[in-house]
Swiss-Prot record:
InterPro entries: Ribosomal_uL22, Ribosomal_uL22_bac/chlpt-type, Ribosomal_uL22_bac/org-type, Ribosomal_uL22_sf. It comes from Sphingopyxis alaskensis (strain DSM 13593 / LMG 18877 / RB2256) (Sphingomonas alaskensis). This is Large ribosomal subunit protein uL22. Pfam families: Ribosomal_L22 (PF00237). Transmembrane segments: none annotated.
Amino acid sequence: MGKEKSPRRVADNEALSVGTQIRGSAQKLNLVAALIRGRKVEDAMNVLAFSKKAMAVDVRKVLASAVANAENNHNLDVDALVVKEASVGKSLSMKRWHARGRGKSTRIVKPFSRIRIVVREQEEEA
């Protein structure tokens, strides 16, 4: 007895990794995600390593996790992996208060975002 195994969320030749609560807005994270969409994994890692964007560090960690999932959990060839999907969305927002003049205050919103990276094993062309 027990629970039935849930179906996979991606195809058999794909692997998935999700990064939640990445500090920064979804708009800024999407700029970095656009750099790697459709690229080979090795190429995408190099682009992220030399990017000046601060969020590139977090995206690189999520991409490395997706590659590790592909290699260890799904037995896919790491050299043939391509970034199929890099989707970005909003997560929670931290609310803080900033003291202003004349006894007033202003609300400061510190946003968090999430990223979902799917890597796919590309077939060899003969």
